[in-house]
């Protein structure tokens, strides 16, 4: 599907200011002192995540985001090769391997071919879940991996043998985040994300993949979801988005330049892959694959392309994003200095 994200930009009308006229009377009486005219207040941009911020309301530098409509193993390889220049040494691939028989996860043959042709020796990495499901324990997790066909390469459950605390620079909730301990075994990280909706996060892009997916199942995920509330799911909306971003920042800072981000916009249910076969039916059309060295740019471009869909085809996913204040992920990543929300698209199909 050819998607024109530029069409979503509103026409901005600039109002002219009319100066007040004044002067002395015929008797040359002193003119009354003029009061300084109040200038119209600049429109405030709502950054709480409940409203979409169009591109013409954003500012700052631009990053490069690559795009292909080719939803196939070859399309994935083609776009990966544009953002892999700093992927060296021992490579981890963070993706959502899904609950048993989950219908929407990234096709295993695509990942198998990518590893065989472009990242030989790479390891898929995951962590155990916070909720009590098929992947709550390491044993159950490994059984689920077999059921879902992730058997063609090593899969490292990062928190299988413990945790490690990574610093969070500039966080307002965290000074450090608890991660799966094996994260320190790897030199580079490929963030391979199935972009979709999410019950709590509004949407799940590269940020959510790392924020929840790299935090260990017992401590780190609880820090994000519950904090000090005493309730398993006590944190929501803006604060939840901000906590996710701070968790992600720990991973992004840890790998430095040796990290890259790929979002696959396919089978985009409003439900996360955590919901497995219970996921809501897909109503949003497939779009393609996006990739960047900038995590904010790739997630922002993914969101922009959903908003650019015509005839209300993105309605369900957009409603999910806005009702959960999920767009706060983007504005807080910008506030945390994690990337740019402006970008240039390089269309690999042209």
Listing of model-derived features with the role each one plays in the protein:
Residues 1-9:
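Bacterial N-terminal signal peptides that target proteins for export
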Residues 21-350:
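N-terminal and secondary-structure boundary signal
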């Amino acid at each position: 599907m050819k998607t024109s994200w530029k069409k979503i930009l509103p026409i901005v009308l600039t109002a002219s200011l009319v100066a007040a006229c004044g002067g002395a009377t015929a008797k040359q009486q002193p003119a009354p002192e003029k009061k300084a005219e109040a200038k119209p207040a600049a429109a405030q941009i709502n950054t709480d995540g409940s409203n979409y911020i169009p591109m013409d309301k954003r500012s700052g530098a631009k990053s490069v985001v690559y795009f292909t409509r080719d939803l196939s193993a070859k399309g994935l390889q083609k776009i990966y090769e544009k953002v892999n220049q700093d992927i060296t040494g021992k490579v981890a691939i963070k993706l959502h391997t899904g609950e048993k028989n989950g219908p929407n996860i990234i096709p295993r043959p695509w990942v198998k071919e990518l590893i065989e042709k472009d990242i030989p020796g790479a390891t898929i990495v995951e962590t155990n879940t916070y909720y009590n499901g098929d992947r709550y324990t390491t044993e159950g997790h490994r059984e689920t991996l077999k059921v879902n066909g992730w058997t063609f390469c090593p899969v490292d459950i990062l928190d299988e043998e413990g945790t490690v605390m990574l610093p969070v620079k500039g966080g307002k909730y965290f000074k450090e985040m608890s991660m799966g301990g094996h994260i320190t075994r790897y030199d580079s990280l490929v963030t391979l994300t199935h972009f979709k909706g999410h019950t709590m996060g509004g949407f799940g892009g590269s940020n959510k993949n790392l924020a929840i997916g790299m935090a260990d199942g017992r401590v780190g995920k609880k820090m994000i979801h519950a904090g000090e509330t005493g309730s398993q799911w006590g944190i929501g909306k803006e604060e939840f988005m901000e906590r996710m971003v701070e968790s992600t920042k720990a991973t992004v800072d840890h790998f430095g330049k040796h990290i890259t981000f790929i979002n696959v916009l396919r089978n985009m249910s409003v439900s996360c892959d955590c919901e497995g076969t219970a996921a809501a039916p897909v109503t949003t059309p497939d779009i393609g694959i996006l990739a960047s060295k900038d995590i904010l740019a790739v997630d922002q471009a993914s969101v922009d392309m959903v908003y650019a869909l015509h005839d209300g085809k993105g309605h369900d996913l957009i409603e999910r994003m806005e009702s959960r204040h999920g767009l706060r992920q983007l504005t807080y990543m910008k506030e945390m200095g994690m990337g740019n929300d402006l970008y240039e698209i390089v269309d690999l199909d042209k």
